[in-house]
Amino acid sequence: MVTRIVILGGGPAGYEAALVAATSHPETTQVTVIDCDGIGGAAVLDDCVPSKTFIASTGLRTELRRAPHLGFHIDFDDAKISLPQIHARVKTLAAAQSADITAQLLSMGVQVIAGRGELIDSTPGLARHRIKATAADGSTSEHEADVVLVATGASPRILPSAQPDGERILTWRQLYDLDALPDHLIVVGSGVTGAEFVDAYTELGVPVTVVASQDHVLPYEDADAALVLEESFAERGVRLFKNARAASVTRTGAGVLVTMTDGRTVEGSHALMTIGSVPNTSGLGLERVGIQLGRGNYLTVDRVSRTLATGIYAAGDCTGLLPLASVAAMQGRIAMYHALGEGVSPIRLRTVAATVFTRPEIAAVGVPQSVIDAGSVAARTIMLPLRTNARAKMSEMRHGFVKIFCRRSTGVVIGGVVVAPIASELILPIAVAVQNRITVNELAQTLAVYPSLSGSITEAARRLMAHDDLDCTAAQDAAEQLALVPHHLPTSN
């Protein structure tokens, strides 16, 4: 019997789910992906891949600024910036990634339909569902499905009094159409997206002002990490309005005017709105299958991505779980394995590593320090500045640190934070420790290359060790050694 699967949305959740179905059950599944924005979704075409490509280009200026300290006297101002070339590279790479994913899906026998999908069941509670796909030219097709995965993603949140025009008032998806650098960029919002673009544009020499709703940037990230980033921003001349919310953003003759709720104003040439996202859950016909949207119009799912409607799953940013491509992809895979009757392990959010791609990068995994400080989790903590690391000194790295958290009684690693130029890579050993419940002693006994930035992770683990950890490890080692010794039991005559 063939299981017919229709996936609404071709982003990480959608295409990963399609690949799972097509590769694990190729003889018994018929997979269709309906997508109106392009395979890869916003993560590949508009958000994650483009922004990180843009950041990679601007990062070259970071190295140039460090060059004089390393004996290379390069005139920083001679590094001419071709913004059209940078943007062309961003768009080319995103399109190529989308094409690669599309080709992979097609090679696996997945049907890809360009259009918008909508559930058209005649009544709630049906075991099989009907979906209508509407193409850009208005033509339609209908499809039956035993399993439906809603993976429609999210879009930039729009402030009614700050309508983006694609010229001066922008969302992060419109930046790559600019022909020239802003004379003065105002970034409204200081979360992950806002912080990343503040960092990138200051590296390009653009004066930047930030309107932050909290008393520091990155309000939902590690407080010490946010402080390091604020210091880095201050060194580059970033002007920061704290505890400020934008009431409106309007066009002026020369640019834009941002008016805050407390009456303060700031003028600039361009405004970038980074005030969060809203789920793409309207117009999908969800009410026809008995699904009611939850808070913020997100789809409510359980830990294996099921909705309350039979045979209908949801994954990715439309569920509001965590706005990360890695989480969306994992949700999609879990949903499809479960739908096909495979055993699955529910997603564990405490094992998800995330990175803010600023300079320095900020990466974290597991239990945050704020939870520990609040007394909710009994833990030991360590914070080791990166400036003590020999490799960091060699490269003139002045900002950053490594944090590790472990359970007070057992020494099991439960979380950590890395602030460093390549924190997105360095967080992996801590994430592995959290995932596999490794102790700080086991992490400390791992031999790190010298000199290396990863050496700070093992050094932090050593400093976090307690005498009880050593006693437990000694007993464990003795038991393991004993197990290796042949035991010749006496035999009776």
Curated annotation (Swiss-Prot):
Residues where FAD binds: P12, A13, D35, C36, D37, A42, A43, K52, G117, D317, L324, A325, Y450
Question: InterPro entries, alphabetically?
Answer: FAD/NAD-bd_sf, FAD/NAD-binding_dom, FAD/NAD-linked_Rdtase_dimer_sf, Pyr_nuc-diS_OxRdtase, Pyr_nucl-diS_OxRdtase_dimer
Q: Which Pfam family name is an example for this entry? A: Pyr_redox_2
The catalytic activity, as recorded, is: a quinone + NADH + H(+) = a quinol + NAD(+); a quinone + NADPH + H(+) = a quinol + NADP(+)
Q: What are the GO BP annotations of this UniProt entry?
A: cellular detoxification
Q: Work out whether the entry's keyword set contains NAD.
A: yes
Q: Which domain of life is it from?
A: Bacteria
Q: Which UniProt keywords apply?
A: FAD, Flavoprotein, NAD, Oxidoreductase
Give the cofactor note.
Binds 1 FAD per subunit.
Please give the start and end residues of each transmembrane region: none
State its cofactor: FAD
Q: What does this protein do?
A: May contribute to virulence by increasing resistance to reactive oxygen intermediates. It can reduce 2,6-dimethyl-1,4-benzoquinone (DMBQ), 5-hydroxy-1,4-naphthaquinone (5-HNQ) and menadione. NADPH is the physiological reductant rather than NADH.
The record's comment on protein family reads: Belongs to the class-I pyridine nucleotide-disulfide oxidoreductase family.
NCBIfam families recorded: PRK07845.1
The entry's protein name is: NAD(P)H dehydrogenase (quinone)
Q: Which organism is it from?
A: Mycobacterium tuberculosis (strain ATCC 25618 / H37Rv)
